[in-house]
């Protein structure tokens, strides 16, 4: 039987299968390369882009343990048939469909996004008997503005800040969110500086058919009229003596009234790589 339990990842005890285990396992399926879904497994199944991201984040020794599986292909693990389907979350992100010889099926949808994105494959939703899904924005108040409105808000913030002689600094997670932001800035023909972690991951996007714009390496000593894109985790590295600047946090949590004060930024912009409440309902 496919009866899932949560034990630091999704576990199917009747067949011994781990998905997105956060501690190393002999074998696991990895839905995508965000750090809260990966570990240094002895062997793991993932899409080729996810394995390439893991190579950058965890090293070549870990990546070599990866078994690449393209979307919609089948991998047999003991008696189980495993398939991966695009989750729309970030490049290479996958939903995991597991089927037993008797035809019983389970779909594990880790992190996913239902809206079309600029830096990820569009979502595909297969049928299954049992669904296990995320609910990051699972409350009715989480209704995002139209994507075009959010994109325009990002561009307006950057242009207004530059016109005021200041440096716009966009805080965006280095895998997924940052790349979508870069595509938005590229379409607006804005000059970009990006942190080295973002630039390294950009190479994987380009290798897998999503070219990223040219960016200058982030140099706090030379911020001349550039839009800076960097992960929020390194915010403390911003020198105190850089030119006047404004900070924007790019996150779906921007919908919360307290977000700007919690993130201590000048503004918050609700671009998310997770499905909102209505997207979760649509998925079901």
Where are these regions (language model features)?
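His/Asp/Glu-rich metal-coordinating catalytic cores
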Residues: 2-12, 16-23, 27, 33-171, ...
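Metal-dependent phosphodiesterase/nuclease catalytic metal-binding core
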Residues: 95-284
């Amino acid at each position: 039987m496919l009866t899932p339990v949560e034990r630091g990842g999704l576990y199917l005890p009747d067949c011994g299968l781990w998905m997105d285990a956060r501690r190393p396992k002999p074998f696991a399926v990895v839905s995508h390369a965000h750090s809260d879904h990966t570990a240094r497994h002895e062997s793991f199944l993932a899409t080729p882009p996810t394995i390439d991201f893991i190579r950058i984040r965890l090293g070549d020794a870990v990546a070599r343990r990866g078994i690449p599986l393209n979307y919609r292909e089948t991998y047999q693990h003991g008696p189980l048939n495993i398939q991966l389907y695009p989750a729309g979350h970030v490049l290479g992100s996958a939903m995991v469909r597991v089927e037993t010889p008797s035809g019983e099926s389970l779909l594990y949808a880790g992190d996913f996004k239902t809206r079309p994105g600029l830096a990820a494959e569009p979502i595909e939703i297969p049928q299954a008997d049992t669904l296990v899904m995320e609910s990051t924005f699972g409350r009715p108040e989480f209704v995002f503005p139209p994507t075009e409105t959010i994109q325009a808000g990002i561009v307006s913030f950057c242009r207004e800040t530059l016109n005021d002689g200041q440096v716009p600094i966009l805080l965006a997670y280095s895998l997924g969110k940052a790349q979508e932001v870069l595509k938005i800035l590229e379409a607006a023909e804005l000059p970009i500086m990006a942190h080295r972690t973002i630039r390294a991951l950009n190479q994987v996007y380009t290798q897998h058919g999503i070219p990223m714009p040219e960016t200058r390496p982030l140099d706090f000593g030379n911020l001349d009229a550039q839009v800076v894109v960097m992960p929020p985790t390194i915010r403390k590295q911003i020198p105190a003596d850089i030119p006047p600047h404004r900070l924007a946090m790019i996150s779906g949590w921007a919908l919360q009234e307290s977000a700007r004060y919690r993130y201590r930024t000048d503004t918050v912009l609700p671009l998310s790589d997770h499905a909102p409440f209505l997207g979760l309902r649509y998925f079901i």
